[in-house]
Amino acid sequence: MFQSKKITLGACVMAAALMAAQAQASEATLKDGKLAIDTLPFTLETQLALGAASVKDKALVLQAKKGTDLYANTDGTEVADKTPRVLFQPTGDFIFSAKVNAGVNHPFNGAALIVYGDRTNWAKLLFEFAKTGAAGISTTVAKGVGDDAHHGVRPGDAVYLKVVRRKDMFVFYTSPDGNAWSMVRSFGLPGAASVKVGFSSQSPDGDGFSAQFSDVKFRNATFKDFWQGE
């Protein structure tokens, strides 16, 4: 009898946890040409001259055409600002994350969360396929010039990315499961209070690339743990 009650209680707990997880899952919709994600309380701005946005299984799918890139070299002589993106403009401190599924299979194809001020002031947290033949994390912070950095390999074809703002500081994080986070880098940007953030996809040397963004989460909050961004 006691064992039966324990099993029943355990099943209830598991069911409740599953329902809670499902309730937290984000849902992207595309209706009458207007894109929305229910966990983002903002009007979404789409820049799709070089790609397309669609919805599949309640996730945002961002398709990049051949030759798309967001890039600045270290002396500012080479600048590219031509990726399909979906952006919104938050205010105050925030914590923003998403799961990225990207079957990255050509060098520099990738999907990113970005912080965008203008053509010369932006930052991206990128899950991309490197020339080494492995998928990993790269970042760039551009302030007229860029500073490409590689942050190691990530196994599989999915990763969680997170962008946090506290006052004028931004912090990038990655996670294999959306629970335990690793801090990648912190930085500042000119006009930090008025930047836009969102999703981007790129295929600078490939024939095109498609990435899926799901489990999108946003809240206006100030992190208490710098190393976790929570």
Segment roles from a protein language model:
Residues 20-25:
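Boundary at the C-terminal end of the N-terminal hydrophobic targeting segment
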Residues 1-10:
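Bacterial N-terminal signal peptides that target proteins for export
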